């Protein structure tokens, strides 16, 4: 009887050990999977400042799609997250000009390669600027965007450091990814456009 009791105790101990090992494996796999997803696919980012107002607000959190760096391509109008050159600061801006294009603003109208380009995401800001009797963007250019670089601007053109005035043209390897979704605050979840 004692021998049988010892065998049962050993079996129970082995089951517990196996259970702990299985849980340990599951936790390690989950952590590795989360790290891989965050590094290569999606990552949350915090919006700091008002340069993208009214599209994005200070304190909102975005999910950034990093797959555009591996598959797909950046498109004009995409909201992009940019690594700072010398610090851990990230910038959130709208992609305006792509490599090889010529960018110009005249009378608050965007021209790419001499052709007018609509910017529907600016309609609210344009109305506010008109009420104040000021130009939303100000004239500039033409600026030729070289190979491997991008021209970006904030939607809050009167209050944005961007390719016009401080950030300069953005190297492709500084673009982390594109924003597609605001997930916080929860009551303001939405797609970004």
Curated annotation (Swiss-Prot):
Record field: catalytic activity: Cleavage of hydrophobic, N-terminal signal or leader sequences from secreted and periplasmic proteins
EC number per UniProt: 3.4.21.89
Keyword Metal-binding listed: no
Topology Extracellular: residue spans: 43-193
Class of the enzyme per the UniProt entry, highest EC level: hydrolase
GO CC annotations, alphabetized: plasma membrane
Domain of life: Bacteria
Protein family: Belongs to the peptidase S26 family.
Misc note: B.subtilis contains five chromosomal type I signal peptidases: SipS, SipT, SipU, SipV and SipW. They have different, but overlapping, substrate specificities and have different transcription patterns.
The protein's name in its UniProt record: Signal peptidase I T
Source species: Bacillus subtilis (strain 168)
This protein's encoding gene: sipT
